[in-house]
Amino acid sequence: MSDDATIPITIEFSGGLEILFANQKKYNLSLPTKDESGEPATVAFLVRYLCDHIMKDPRKELFVLDDTVRPGILVLINEADWELEGEDKYQVQKDDHIMFVSTLHGG
């Protein structure tokens, strides 16, 4: 496998997060297999990648806080809570379906 290889994954945003991503709820992405330091791609790298390459809204603080998904955002990896998968240390796999759901709603 070459260093420029990618992993096909599906990303979804819900609960209002799609507003930060050009009002698009679903993305089919080709994520690089390695992060900036040459390590296998993890959810932490995916979050950075989304902020740097996909998010057009300048309000990144509504999605991330201290380099991780901010509290109040549920992350599902293949329909399972990311806490069961190792949270942001989970290594992204081919055809993963990763969903970010805001559980915070205005009144």
UniProtKB/Swiss-Prot annotation:
C-terminal thiocarboxylation occurs in 2 steps, it is first acyl-adenylated (-COAMP) via the hesA/moeB/thiF part of UBA4, then thiocarboxylated (-COSH) via the rhodanese domain of UBA4. Its main location: cytoplasm. Pathway: tRNA modification; 5-methoxycarbonylmethyl-2-thiouridine-tRNA biosynthesis. One of its GO terms (cellular component) is cytosol. Pfam families: Urm1. One of its GO terms (biological process) is protein urmylation. There is a cross-link at G107 (Glycyl lysine isopeptide (Gly-Lys) (interchain with K-? in acceptor proteins)). The modification 1-thioglycine is found at G107. InterPro entries: Beta-grasp_dom_sf (IPR012675), Mopterin_synth/thiamin_S_b (IPR016155), Urm1 (IPR015221). Disulfide bonds: none annotated. Acts as a sulfur carrier required for 2-thiolation of mcm(5)S(2)U at tRNA wobble positions of cytosolic tRNA(Lys), tRNA(Glu) and tRNA(Gln). Serves as sulfur donor in tRNA 2-thiolation reaction by being thiocarboxylated (-COSH) at its C-terminus by the MOCS3 homolog UBA4. The sulfur is then transferred to tRNA to form 2-thiolation of mcm(5)S(2)U. Prior mcm(5) tRNA modification by the elongator complex is required for 2-thiolation. Also acts as a ubiquitin-like protein (UBL) that is covalently conjugated via an isopeptide bond to lysine residues of target proteins such as AHP1. HAMAP family: Urm1. Belongs to the URM1 family. This is Ubiquitin-related modifier 1. It comes from Pyrenophora tritici-repentis (strain Pt-1C-BFP).
